[in-house]
Amino acid sequence: MPPSTSRLRGEILIVLALSLGMSALYAIVGFSRRLSIETPLNEQQATINRSLADESIFDLVYQLLGIASAWAPVLLVGFLLWSSQKPHLGALGWSAPRWPDLWWGVGLAALIGIPGLGVYVAGVQSGLTVQVVPTALEQYWWTIPVLLLRALTAGVVEETIAVGYLYRRLSQLAWSPVAIILTQAILRGAYHLYQGAGAFVGNVAMGLIFGWYYHRTGRLAPLIAAHTLIDAVAFVGYPLVSADVVQTLGFAG
């Protein structure tokens, strides 16, 4: 028996309150606070990955705990949409991976990442975007593996919930594909608003492209691959780029 409309709405609110919806609220409040201070946006900084303890072992433990907790909403929506028939998570766009998914992911990463860098630079130069620090982690033996794991986590969490889960549940509420894609895109922009208005615009555009792709294919793997690749390049590549290039691109050094 399919869930009632009121139950679906309540479920969506709970899932978002435990994940990206709450992140969006924090980002909106954070952006409002940034606007309230005298320092221009493009002179402020937003650090994505930071050290959580002075001691290497405790920093690692905290990082892994943070990653594990981020996966909890994914497990929740997987539990809610699990089917006894294969593919068990087909309602979320999860099915057996295929090699073309990887190549589509690379293509989508290039389509989003290259123009996205331009949007970021333009946003910083115009004063609409803060200087982003992709990582401020100390250099330990575990730093790169943790950064890659964080990139994968961001890809899985955001695409599973913002795209796969919302598309399924909002479709059950008889929303049109256009309304669903717009909602997904605005949500994606909202929880990136802590980086400034430029990041909001860029991520809304990313959400529109990803939403359209999912509407046409119903496959989540290429989106996860693309998102993971974009974040992995930013997180791992940032410390390897010279200070001059970092400053030219508008990243905080």
Language-model segments: residues:
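Interfacial segments of alpha-helical transmembrane regions
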Residues: A91-I114
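Residue-level signature of transmembrane alpha-helical entry/exit and packing/kink sites
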Residues: R7-V15, D59-A70, P100-G105, T143-L147, ...
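Transmembrane helix-loop-helix hairpins at the membrane interface
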Residues: L20-A24, G113-L117, V121-G253
